[in-house]
């Protein structure tokens, strides 16, 4: 049973990677409304997640963990959101919370640390 769960969790990371590649994320990208809409559509289709609802949640990290997102998947999602969504206070707070959450678990994300500064 544990092997099955680990495989399912790994699939989430793989799907996020495929979405990032499909949308051209991974390099330096200037966020645009079109890119935000594309990412939102992909996340809705693949994971039934709405970006705007996620950003408004009181504890989005708990929500993602409950949905089976691994630390790696949470990191990838935060990076994709940073690259696809125009910077707002809410997004910056979410990314800072992701960094703190991962740090507390002993998972260091150099990419997210470089974003937070």
Feature annotation, model-predicted:
Residues 3-4, 8, 69-76, 90, ...:
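Structural signature of alpha-solenoid helical repeat junctions
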Residues 10, 15, 76-83, 114-117:
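"A position-specific structural signal for the A-helix of alpha-solenoid helical repeats
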Residues 1-72, 100-101:
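N-terminal alpha-helical interaction modules that lie
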Residues 82-117:
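Amphipathic alpha-helical binding modules
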Residues 61-94:
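Charged low-complexity stretches with an acidic bias
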